[in-house]
């Protein structure tokens, strides 16, 4: 519950569970897990992530961060085991793979994937972007959403720009009339 909620409400990559840090009471930060040509050898500071709550469950994201920070609620043991091995293995991917394995074993996830074509654990992260841009009365700018999710606007648009349709453009324009 905690891992799934943190990912879905904060738009985390699955493997970012390994880098969670709570600062200043209830502000959630994640460290960099991406290794590519652009950031090779660079020290990338942790980025702050923000909850986009479920309607009717306002404050749930902050509640989950508080649970995590308290230490009373933890991530599943198998995920914690992989987090402890990150430095030794020099990779984060096993954290996400373990979460995927854990989800695939649950009855509710099996039911959801059977009912929802194309649903994957990464859909939890994609939910954040969808809420940010398409399911809110106050959409978040592409630049701000991309920054919160830890990628460039180009990357953000390449993944999430396909959600544009004539109907969505018409609705957006109508809101500004």
List the model feature ranges, each with a label.
Residues 23-29, 138-159:
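Short, polar N-cap/turn motifs at the start of nucleic acid-interacting alpha helices
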Residues 10, 19-63:
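Conserved tyrosine-mediated DNA breakage-rejoining catalytic core shared by Y-recombinases
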Residues 108, 121, 147, 172-175:
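Recognition helices and adjacent regulatory flanks at domain boundaries
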